[in-house]
Structure formats: structure tokens, C-alpha cells
């Protein structure tokens, strides 16, 4: 993400899009070989030139994001206003650091693969062969599944909640994320018009307290250190950002 690369890439994007500016320009991946200062200075130049309105990042760890925000503050540069992250009912790892960071620093969260690569679509059930041509029959390995029994428990609970409400598992999984703190939008990957229409239906309703509690419980992330210590020793001193992860544990 060198200065030369970013300036040239933005110009090429503007030509392809046939527009004068880009509303949100996000650094898609962390470049550990280019100084963050150089990357942010280039992005700041694009904003000041009027070619970009706002900047964001994607697939950064929390310390990378905070380092970038600190550099922007110290140097008077444009700061990231969004982060695009993987987050789903199946994988709530983002709640350890990335979601609390977004709440604390005022970043909007754009979620990619909110259906966990289709695993939460309702197509994949225990002891049932996946449909021919479905994504999980391809060599693509993201997101990784480390515990298939846990995955099926989540899928089964999701299907039960969806069936009781009369919605699809996919729509229910999307509605779950839309009700999570800091989440501002979902990047969906529907392949058909029918899938798209079904997915978009998630904005028309919200999960009730019991439904959300059921899904929270079955998908709860394991409390790793220092979070179990924080939940046990200082539960009355948690901020809103802390509560995004720790609320159910105290």
C-alpha cells in the first residue's frame, strides 16, 4: 500500500467507474511491508484532492486499526471511519476486539460473508450431502470450520428459530447481525434474484429477546484471557464497548 500504488490505483478506479470521486475507499488488506504513515498520507492526499470522500480498512487486526487511528490523530491526517470485517453467527471472533474497538472509536462496521460462506443459508445440515454446485463443494476454504459439531448445533438452532417465525435461516442469520452493536451494513453475496429478495427481507423485522438469547447462547465465543478475568473481577466497571462481548457473562 505504497503512496505510488494507492494514487495510481485510485486513478484507475475512477476511470473504470466513470466518476469524479469515490464515497468510501477502503484498504482491503494490511500491508506489513509499507509504513502505515505512508499509506495514510496517500489516503489523506486523495481526500484532500476531492477524489475520495472517506477512508476505511478491511481485514485488519485491532492493533493495526488503533495504530492507524493514532497516526492519523498525531499527524492530522484523515482517519478510518469504517472497517469491513468477517463476522457471522457462526464466527463471533470479532467481538473480542474489533467490535468493541468500533464502538469505542466510532467506526462503522461493514460485514462481509455474513452467512459464513453459505453455511448459514439452510443448505447445510448434519449427515446430509451439500447440494451440487454449492460453495462448500469447491476448494475455497474460507471461512475455516474448526468444530463441525458446533457448526451444526448453531445451524440447527438457527433453523428452529427461523421455522418458528416463518422466515428462512439465511434471513434470520442476517437479522441477527443487524441487531449487533456497531454493525451498519452487510455485504451479501446472493447468486440469484430469489436469494437476493430473501436476504433483503432481513431489514423488515427484528429478533425478539427470546430468539436473540437462543442464538446468543448457542454461538457464544469462548472467553479467552483477559476477558474471563475482566468479567469475573470488574463487571461493574465495564464500558459500552466492553459490554459488546461481556454482557452475557456477568
PLM-predicted stretches and their roles:
Residues 49-50, 105, 165:
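Helix C-cap/helix->beta junction micro-motif
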Residues 1-93, 97:
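Glycine/proline-rich, positively charged
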Residues 61, 87-91, 113-120, 176, ...:
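Glycine-rich beta-alpha junction loops
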Residues 94-133, 168:
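Aromatic-lined glycan-binding groove of carbohydrate-active enzymes
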Residues 184-195:
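Glycine-rich phosphate-binding active-site loops on the catalytic face of alpha/beta enzymes
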Residues 128-160, 164, 179-183, 197-250:
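Terminal-tail/helix-coil boundary detector
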Residues 13, 22, 35, 55, ...:
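Conserved, mostly hydrophobic/aromatic
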Residues 18-21, 159-175:
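Acyl activation and transfer enzymes in specialized metabolism, enriched
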